[in-house]
Structures are given as C-alpha cells and as structure tokens.
Regions:
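Terminal alpha-helical segments
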Residues: 1-122
C-alpha cells in the first residue's frame, strides 16, 4: 500500500503536470482538470493513510470516507465538485475553458490542499 509520503509525491507530480500548461493556449484543458482532481485525490489518500491506515481504492469508497471522516468532512463539497468537473471533462466530454479552470478548478483544489496539508507531517 502506498504511504503518506508516496501519495504526497504523486499529488505533487499531478499538480506540477497541471501547472505546466498555458491555460490560454493549450488544447489539453481536459487533462489540466483531470490532473488537479488526481492531485486532490492523492492528498485525500495521504491523509486517510496517515490518520487511519486506510489504503486508496475505489472512487465510491473514497467518497464515503470524505463524507464520514471528521478530518475530511469540511472539504466534502469541494472534493465532490472537483470530481464532478473531472468527470465532465473525461466522460461527458464537456469543453473546459481557462476561465472555468482559473475561477473554479484551481480554487477547489486549493481549498482541499489548504485543509489537508496542515494535518500531515512536515
């Protein structure tokens, strides 16, 4: 099972991938949204492992943990919304825009990051 440190490394990798794109010119905005979501997912998995030794797993199981764990409940809505945007991009083929990413996706990710990182060891 991946450790807290491994999940954090993958979260940083996904975040770096998302941030490398010029949002005004890239044709890959769907991948940007997806990368922000997976960065958030690995932050959630890092905290689940750190607090309760819960391994990462299926999206449905993780969603239930985000709803039920007291240390994750505060980001329940942000996590769900970010996941929904990612699914819009991946499965429903909804066109993403730089404005949507700047005004919705990045703030959602940042709220999750700001909630989780202080709870993890330095």
């Amino acid at each position: 099972m991946p450790t807290t440190r491994e999940h954090l490394a993958r979260a940083r990798q996904n975040l770096a991938f998302a941030q490398q794109f010029n949002l005004k010119t890239t044709p890959y905005l769907d991948w940007v949204v997806t990368a922000y979501f997976y960065a958030a997912l690995h932050l959630v998995d890092a905290l689940l492992w750190e607090k309760d030794k819960v391994p990462g797993g299926l999206h449905e199981i993780r969603r239930d943990y985000v709803k039920s764990k007291s240390y994750l409940r505060a980001i329940r809505d942000q996590y769900k919304e970010l996941k929904d945007h990612s699914e819009d991009a991946r499965y429903r083929l909804i066109t993403m825009t730089s404005t949507r990413i700047e005004q919705k996706i990045i703030p959602l990710y940042k709220a999750i990051e700001d909630h989780i990182l202080p709870q993890l060891p330095k």
